[in-house]
């Protein structure tokens, strides 16, 4: 089959070149369609169920809303687990499905279950589903603010800015292709407030509810069918909707002593502010912040660019003096990451080409070999587009051009050798027919081991396809891309390379060693003889190195995946529970002023509390602060590191009392939270029933965690300390007055929280009309006690009132700030970040300390979460994958040689290669990670290539030329020096830029590249120095029947 392909490629060589050109053009076309991102989206399939329940305490939210919804979600197909959050007035249940579940199918299932549970929820409570987005969903953020050169007198107030955002900017952005949602926080939603005067209401014998009912009865348009007159149909409408504030003021509530009482007689009508749950700040001033969420499955770079382009158009339509400023754009990170990958690949390709020129000694031959790189990449891009693989840090992170050209190198090198030998034998330049025949023979001679080597590397990556969860989403694209690239290189090695050699390698050819190969050969011959004669010592030393590396590996420590340096900082600021939103904004202003003193900081903005869509519900006392940094080139001290800057910022803001902080990065923060429900590297989850016991146990665990070296930002989840003002109604007194509890509740709700009585339309815009007491009265507890409660009408039809204090008392108390649950069980989380230490050793030490020092009450237990949870899952999976990979390699080697002995000989390249990888990590101070683990998997395939080539050649010498064992070993080793060095150098140098890069995203690629480079170096030494001796030892015994006089050694 392979021979037929080669003969076809040579016979129709110009067609092959034309076909190659078509593939290249297709690749260029697909490059325009290739989705580009920073990293793969590793978020699990999840749906958020948000329920607003105004006035409900966390206990009531948990009991009446969260628990019924959790119960309804039980038993859903493909359900993984549920977790929930119950806060004052808000329930959020997150339903996590198994990987591969269709998000639209999952949402359909949840909607069906919500319909079933609807009747069990409190009246008036409605559930909504979160946007169809992921942890990487927040791709674009912008602030709506006044232009800096506009006089303060002409500034738009926060309510007007919010109106511009809600009715001008947001609708246009939601129409951008690929946008799932535009979330808003900050400013105030515009409302029309009717603020009654309690004394006037009493004077006219009216209640607060009378005002609401009057508004509801006088603010509607109705249709009354139609009539037919003279053969014409006339529709009948009865408009009654209010058009402006004057219409509201003129609404008649009732008649008092024969005179109509209008709303204007008992209340003021004016523009008002909503009772908001969140705010936004930028550089110590309040702003309106919009966040664009990408639709799941869309490409973030493309959608970000569309949003940015649309934002430019929108800015042209905004009112004079207002602008929307981009404060966060994912494209910046994507471009920086892709630039790092691009530079690594280009530098790697350049290094590979240099090695090809040096070793092949023929410009045309080197160019033919080098052409396989861009051709394979273009075909790989086509494969990525067809398989919906985005180009990102991980998918392109393991591409090694050295491996891609390996097959082509072997073929071209063998063709040059045979062409030169044939020309030398005939003493003339070969004609076309002779050249094609030699090229066909030379290619066929090495194509099987060459293809087999590529096949081994491909098989090595196949087990990575079995990874699941976060590690699967991270490394699956990498394995798929490498496999596609290797298959592409195999195709071009079979077709393009022989055709190109036949066309371009004409004229007189000489296979001569250049100066580099000549001197390397001389030096290698001397070292080889010494190592061969001291082979047992050399083999023993190699075994000792393997043993030492095992000891080092156990002390390297471990982490899940090296954190991608996103370039910016996310700071989670927490104040005392119960801190008002107004006070939190004041404290946030101080924090931002302190942060802006650092010259490295470009911009600071923050989200406080919960936004319009509760994708990330936070209480008012908590703020997510985004610190956007300048380019590293613009830092006053370029030597300063980002961790160093974080420590300086932390020291500065810690001086502001009443705040606690934890530092992370924007994407990392959302990933951690959405995947495991926490925002930190490590989480200790304490499960149980009683909140006080949970909190006490969590505090004890926190105290122990703080003593572990490397612990930072250790804190217990804020679950207590929410101040409540409870209106405790006396049922006995209520009964004496003949009142219903609902009457009292309604009066309090309208007075303090306000009640919507209708809407006022301004063109396409619509705004709520709300009835509540004036701000100066509703915030005063003493006034609250004096709220008038309407009594049932007396016998003479008179309306009388009593103050609230007659039937109820106000009681101050504390409530849980929030109640978190996981799989239906309450939990409290202790979180910590790990700095200047690897994750694995930190958790190991923390576990020992907690197990020894903290006694858990009966019925309570702990689990470890955060990134450590993902690390453990990945390690368990790799414990299965790695042995299967090694077994697969051995079976392939056995199939190749047909002998266990030779298969074992080549297989020995893997332990010493892994040794080099471990030493390389140890020398660079890099802990073991899933990235390094994938590097070891890839290395195990690369490690056997050189051994495969050398053993195959030595066996060939012994079988075909009947060379004695020692001569065969030494001659075969020397003859294979150039291909072994070329393979090793091109494979390792292709990874050098990744190992040394410092750009955005380089930290993720560094462990993998370091492992491969270190492993290839040690594997090359094994192949050149240890393997010859091993071969002699393995094959040195005389076979039965062999003559004793037959020489076993011959002087070289």
Curated annotation (Swiss-Prot):
One Pfam family of this chain: ACR_tran
Keyword DNA repair: no
Topology relative to the membrane: Multi-pass membrane protein
Keyword Signal found: no
Keywords assigned by UniProt, alphabetized: Cell inner membrane, Cell membrane, Membrane, Transmembrane, Transmembrane helix, Transport
The organism's place on the tree of life at top rank: Bacteria
Cellular location(s): Cell inner membrane
Gene Ontology molecular function: any one: xenobiotic transmembrane transporter activity
Primary location recorded for the protein, binned into one broad class: membrane
Record-annotated membrane-spanning stretches: 14-34, 121-141, 348-368, 369-389, 393-413, 450-470, 483-503, 537-557, 878-898, 903-923, 934-954, 979-999, 1011-1031
One GO CC annotation: plasma membrane
PANTHER family reported in the protein's UniProt record: CATION EFFLUX SYSTEM (ACRB_ACRD_ACRF FAMILY), PTHR32063
Family label: Belongs to the resistance-nodulation-cell division (RND) (TC 2.A.6) family.
Function, in words: Presumed to function with HelC and HelB in efflux of an unidentified substrate.
Record's protein name: Protein HelA
Source organism: Legionella pneumophila
């Amino acid at each position: 089959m392979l021979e037929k392909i080669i003969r076809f490629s040579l016979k129709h060589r110009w067609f092959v070149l034309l076909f190659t050109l078509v593939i290249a053009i297709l690749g260029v076309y697909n490059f325009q369609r290739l989705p580009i991102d920073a990293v793969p989206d590793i978020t699990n399939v999840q749906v958020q169920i948000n329920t607003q329940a105004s006035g409900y305490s966390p206990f009531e939210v948990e009991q009446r809303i969260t628990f019924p919804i959790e119960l309804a979600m039980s038993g859903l197909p493909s359900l993984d687990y549920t977790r929930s959050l119950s806060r004052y007035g808000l329930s959020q249940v997150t339903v996590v499905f198994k990987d591969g579940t269709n998000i639209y199918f999952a949402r359909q299932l949840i909607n069906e279950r919500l319909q079933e549970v609807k009747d069990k929820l409190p009246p008036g409570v409605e559930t909504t589903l979160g946007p169809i987005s992921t942890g990487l969903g927040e791709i674009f953020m912008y602030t709506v603010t006044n232009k800096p050169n506009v006089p303060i007198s002409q500034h738009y107030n926060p309510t007007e800015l919010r109106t511009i955002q809600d009715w001008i900017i947001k609708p246009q952005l939601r129409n951008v292709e690929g946008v799932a949602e535009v979330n808003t926080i900050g400013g105030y939603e515009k409302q029309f407030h009717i603020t009654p005067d309690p004394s006037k209401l009493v004077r006219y014998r009216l209640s607060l509810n009378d005002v609401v009912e009057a508004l509801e009865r006088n603010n509607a348009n109705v249709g009354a069918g139609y009539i037919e007159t003279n053969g014409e149909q006339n529709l009948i409408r009865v408009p009654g909707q209010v058009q402006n504030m004057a219409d509201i003021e003129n609404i008649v509530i009732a008649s008092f002593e024969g005179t109509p009482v209008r709303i204007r007689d008992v209340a003021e009508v004016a523009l008002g502010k909503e009772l908001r749950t969140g705010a936004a700040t930028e550089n110590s001033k309040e702003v309106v912040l919009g966040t664009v969420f990408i639709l799941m499955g869309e490409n973030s770079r493309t959608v970000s660019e569309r949003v940015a382009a649309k934002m430019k158009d929108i800015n042209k339509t905004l009112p004079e003096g207002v602008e929307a400023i981009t404060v966060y754009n994912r494209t910046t990170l994507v471009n920086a990451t892709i630039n790092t990958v691009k530079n690594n690949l280009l530098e790697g390709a350049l290094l590979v080409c240099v090695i090809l020129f040096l070793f092949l000694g023929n410009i045309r031959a080197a160019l033919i070999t080098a052409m396989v790189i861009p051709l394979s990449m273009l075909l790989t891009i086509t494969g990525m587009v067809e398989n919906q693989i985005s180009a990102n840090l991980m998918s392109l992170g393991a591409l090694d051009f050295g491996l891609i050209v390996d097959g082509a190198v072997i073929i071209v090198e063998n063709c040059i050798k045979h062409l030169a030998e044939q020309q030398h034998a005939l003493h003339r330049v070969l004609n076309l027919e002779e050249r094609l025949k030699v090229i066909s023979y030379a290619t066929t001679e090495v194509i099987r081991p060459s293809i087999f080597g590529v096949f081994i590397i491909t098989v090595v990556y196949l087990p990575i396809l079995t990874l699941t969860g976060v590690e699967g989403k991270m490394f699956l694209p990498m394995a798929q891309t490498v496999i596609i690239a290797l298959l592409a290189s195999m195709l071009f090695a079979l077709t393009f390379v022989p055709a190109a050699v036949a066309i371009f390698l004409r004229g007189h050819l000489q296979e001569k060693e250049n100066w580099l190969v000549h001197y390397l050969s001389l030096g290698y011959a001397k070292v080889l003889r010494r190592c061969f004669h001291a082979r047992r010592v050399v083999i023993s030393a190699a075994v000792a190195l393997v043993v030492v590396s095992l000891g080092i590996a156990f002390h390297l420590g471990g982490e899940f995946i090296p954190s991608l340096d996103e370039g910016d900082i996310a700071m989670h600021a927490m104040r005392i529970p119960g801190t008002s939103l107004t006070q939190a904004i004041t404290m946030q202003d101080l924090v931002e002023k302190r942060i802006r003193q650092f010259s490295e900081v470009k911009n600071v903005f923050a989200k406080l509390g919960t936004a319009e869509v509760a994708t990330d519900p936070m209480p008012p006392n908590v703020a997510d602060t985004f610190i956007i940094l300048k380019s590293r080139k613009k830092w006053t001290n370029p030597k300063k590191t980002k961790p160093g800057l974080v420590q300086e910022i932390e020291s500065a803001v810690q001086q502001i009392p009443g705040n606690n902080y934890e530092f992370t990065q924007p994407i990392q923060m959302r990933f951690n939270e959405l995947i495991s429900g926490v925002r930190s590297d490590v989480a200790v989850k304490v499960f149980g029933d009683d909140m006080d016991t949970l909190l006490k146990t969590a505090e004890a665990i926190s105290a122990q965690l703080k003593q572990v070296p490397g612990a930072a930002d250790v804190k217990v989840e804020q679950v207590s300390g929410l101040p409540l003002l409870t209106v405790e109604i006396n049922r006995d007194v209520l009964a004496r007055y003949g009142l219903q509890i609902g009457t009292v509740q309604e009066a309090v709700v309208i007075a303090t929280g306000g009640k919507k009585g209708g809407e006022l339309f301004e063109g396409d815009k619509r705004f709520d009309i709300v009835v509540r007491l004036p701000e100066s009265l509703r915030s005063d507890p003493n006034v609250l006690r004096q709220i008038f409660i309407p009594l049932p009408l007396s016998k003479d039809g008179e309306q009388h009132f009593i103050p609230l204090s007659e039937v109820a008392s106000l009681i101050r108390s504390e409530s849980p700030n929030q109640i978190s649950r996981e799989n239906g069980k309450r939990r409290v989380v202790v979180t910590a970040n790990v700095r200047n230490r690897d994750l694995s050793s930190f958790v190991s030490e923390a576990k020992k300390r907690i197990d020894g020092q903290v006694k858990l009450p009966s019925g309570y237990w702990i689990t470890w979460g955060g990134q450590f949870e993902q690390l453990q899952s990945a390690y368990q999976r790799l414990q299965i994958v790695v042995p299967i990979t090694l077994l697969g390699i051995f079976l392939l080697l056995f199939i190749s040689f047909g002998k266990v002995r030779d298969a074992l000989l080549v297989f020995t390249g893997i332990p010493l290669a892994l040794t080099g990888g471990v030493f390389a990590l140890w020398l660079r101070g890099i802990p073991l990670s899933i990235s390094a683990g994938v590097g070891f998997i890839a290395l195990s395939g690369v490690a056997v290539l050189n051994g495969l080539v050398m053993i195959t050649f030595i066996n060939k010498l012994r079988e075909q030329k009947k060379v004695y064992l020692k001569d065969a070993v030494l001659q075969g080793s020397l003859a294979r020096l150039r291909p072994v060095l070329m393979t090793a150098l091109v494979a390792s140098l292709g990874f050098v830029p990744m190992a040394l890069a410092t750009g955005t995203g380089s930290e993720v690629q560094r462990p993998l590249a370091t492992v491969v480079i270190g492993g290839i170096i040690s594997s090359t030494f094994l192949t050149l120095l240890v393997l010859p001796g091993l071969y002699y030892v393995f094959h040195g015994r005389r076979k039965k029947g062999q003559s004793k006089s037959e020489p076993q050694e011959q002087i070289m």
